[in-house]
Every structure is written in structure tokens, then in C-alpha cells.
């Protein structure tokens, strides 16, 4: 583990956060929502940049989540299983304007699940900030067709068997 690597990662996260701060400045974002676990770091940076709380949907209800929850099922293509994703009703209300944040967008199941959670709460989805979108997979197109505004900061057209990325 190197502090130089950690510092570089944090600087990148802060740059991503600033891009989303600028892109969604007029949308009165009140909360940021991501899904555990890989999106948490960039969502936290975005929350700091925007000065708003960050929520993360848990992949299953745990004993430290009291009371009612909003829940949905999200299929993980990476792990080949379904997760019952939850967020506490205490933290998301119809008065919120929510920015969804995640590190990758591929098939779109995680992002669609986050949309479902926000819709259950009656809150407004202002859009999604995505670090890397795999454009050769259908998630981004499907979600845009549903009307979701997506701000992807890197868009990958293809990945070759030889490791090449376009």
C-alpha cells in the first residue's frame, strides 16, 4: 500500500466530484445515493463537493437498519446473483432531490435499482453521475430511454480480447 497511490486516487475522486458538482449545480441536489460498496468512495467525494449527505443502499437488510426500508431486487451480472437492496425510509423522503452516483455503468441493473428506491420514496431523481460507462453494454441506453439524465465522465466503446480499450 502506497500513500502516493492513495493520494492519487483521492485527487481523482475529487476531480470527478467537481465535474458532477458543476454538471448538477442547478438541480438543487439534497442527497446522493449509491450502492455498496465500490461506489461509496466517489459518492463521498461528490457529497463533500456538493455539501450534501451521502446514502448507500445496502445489498441486504442488516440489524443496524431499524424500521422501514425501501427495497428492490438487483441482479449482479458480475457475481451472478440477486441482491435485495435496501435503504432506510428515515433517510430518503419525497422532499429530496437525489443524485445517483456509481463507479461503473454496464448493464444498468444497479442504477435501475437505485432509481426504483428513489421512486418508492417519492423523491426526485435529478440524474446519475457515473465514473466509467461501458457503452458497448445496454445499461446506459436503456436508462436514457427511460428519461434518466446520465453524466458519464469516461465512456468505453469497446474492450478487446487483447486488453485494448477504446
Residue map of PLM features:
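Short, small-residue-biased leader/transition segments that mark boundaries at the very start
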Residues: 1-7
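A short, well-structured juxtamembrane/interface segment
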Residues: 9-29
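Short glycine-rich phosphate-binding loop at a beta-alpha junction
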Residues: 29-36
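Conserved acidic residues
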Residues: 30, 96, 126
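Short Gly/Thr/Asp-enriched flexible loops that form oxyanion-binding sites at enzyme active sites
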Residues: 41-50, 115
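Short, glycine/charge-rich flexible loops or terminal/linker lids adjacent to PRPP-binding catalytic cores
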Residues: 52-98, 164-166
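Conserved G/P- and acidic residue-centered "switch" motifs that form tight phosphate/ATP-binding loops
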Residues: 103, 108
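PRPP-dependent phosphoribosyltransferase catalytic core
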Residues: 113-166
Amino acid at each position: 500500500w502506497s500513500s502516493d497511490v492513495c493520494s492519487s486516487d483521492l485527487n481523482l475522486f475529487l476531480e470527478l466530484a467537481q465535474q458532477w458538482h458543476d454538471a448538477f449545480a442547478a438541480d438543487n441536489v439534497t442527497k446522493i445515493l449509491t450502492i455498496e460498496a465500490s461506489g461509496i468512495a466517489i459518492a463521498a467525494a461528490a457529497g463533500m463537493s456538493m455539501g450534501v449527505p451521502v446514502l448507500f443502499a445496502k445489498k441486504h437488510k442488516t440489524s443496524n437498519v431499524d424500521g422501514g426500508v425501501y427495497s428492490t431486487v438487483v441482479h449482479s451480472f458480475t457475481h451472478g446473483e440477486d441482491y435485495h437492496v435496501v435503504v432506510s425510509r428515515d433517510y430518503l423522503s419525497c422532499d429530496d432531490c437525489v443524485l445517483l452516483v456509481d463507479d461503473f455503468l454496464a448493464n444498468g441493473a444497479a442504477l435501475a435499482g437505485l432509481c426504483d428506491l428513489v421512486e418508492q420514496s417519492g423523491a426526485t431523481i435529478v440524474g446519475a453521475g457515473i465514473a466509467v460507462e461501458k457503452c458497448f453494454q445496454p445499461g446506459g441506453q436503456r436508462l436514457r430511454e427511460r428519461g434518466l439524465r446520465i453524466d458519464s465522465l469516461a465512456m468505453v466503446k469497446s474492450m478487446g480480447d487483447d486488453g485494448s480499450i477504446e
